[in-house]
């Protein structure tokens, strides 16, 4: 058994790794980051760019608005904007410094149909980006794999920029992941261990990250409610039933996504590599904490509970799949709401199982305006799951994917998302890119 200090350090490390800031949807931002790094390596604006991506990257970049772009969409826009005006040192906030001059130059370059070529790469990890940029007879290559800022290849004219071979760079990145996994292996994550940490643990090392999540994600939610972004899902909900805490919880989460999916330049704290999931983990919990008049310390611990449960569930699915990640985040939010309301550990677990038994398996068909509606639906299911659990009700083991314990249910749903939905993911992409004609 790990000591409390080992457990606390491991979970604080998870929170600090997860809760990084990103400006806009993380997939186009990752493309922009790779392009900015390639341009920086060349030392000038590229003469030509090739961007090769996995299907999931193409799916998630196709329809979402690239932040600070003036309303542009797509991989070409993200890559060229990153190359022209991005600051690679800012990582997932790479486009924060883009100005009107940059946007005008990007429009000029995109008018040349041959300036930036995009291709689909098969047989690679779900999160894969390779940018090849050329200028003045030189070629810079940046490859990102598995995580949005995980650079596994960075070369100039075939010579590794990091001072190691491309294979060594990739091996180094893999070794860091393996070391992190080993560091946390003695502290297995489960609903029980997460609650132990939240109720009794020393959270100080992760407090600043969660405080920033509450501040940033609260700000983009307020922006989404104050102004017309996207399909205005949050404003629609708030206009219909503002006197209902459950509806307000859905509205605040959806509003953050309304703004983020449609080009709002405000940064967010991400969870599981996703700003939408970072928003979904935090906003419903913030609304219920305010409604219940909880003190700030209890709010911080509740948001941590939400984040960690989302990470725990998502770990069974992996980065980017056909399984909508907002479901994982909503499970976390629902569990945190149950905790705020004084629910037992059994009721917290039942909230998660009830939510997965309801909306587990909603498909991801790319980042776009309707993500806000999926977040609303997921949070609605989580609140129903919470209400059922608090009244001693729930779905029985053996019904669908519901198992004897919440951990077994999480594992079964994760298997479906990771393995069972692989073909679903392919068919969704084929329809989106026009490869499959259904009528």
Identify what each model region corresponds to.
Residues 32-129, 133:
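Early transmembrane hairpin of solute transport permeases
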Residues 111-263, 429-439:
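Signature of multi-pass transmembrane helix bundles
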Residues 21-37, 266-283, 324-328:
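Conserved phosphate/anionic-ligand binding catalytic regions in large, soluble enzymes, centered on
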Residues 7-17, 25, 89-133, 196, ...:
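Functionally critical mobile loop/hinge segments
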Residues 11-20, 57-66, 259-270, 310-320, ...:
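Glycine/charged-rich beta-loop-alpha catalytic/anionic-binding loops adjacent to active sites
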Residues 243, 247, 260-293:
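Membrane-embedded translocation segments of transport machinery
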Residues 2-13, 45-57, 244-263, 295-313, ...:
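Acidic-glycine-rich active-site phosphate/pyrophosphate-binding loop
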Residues 39, 67, 288-301, 311-377, ...:
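Hydrophobic alpha-helical bundle architecture
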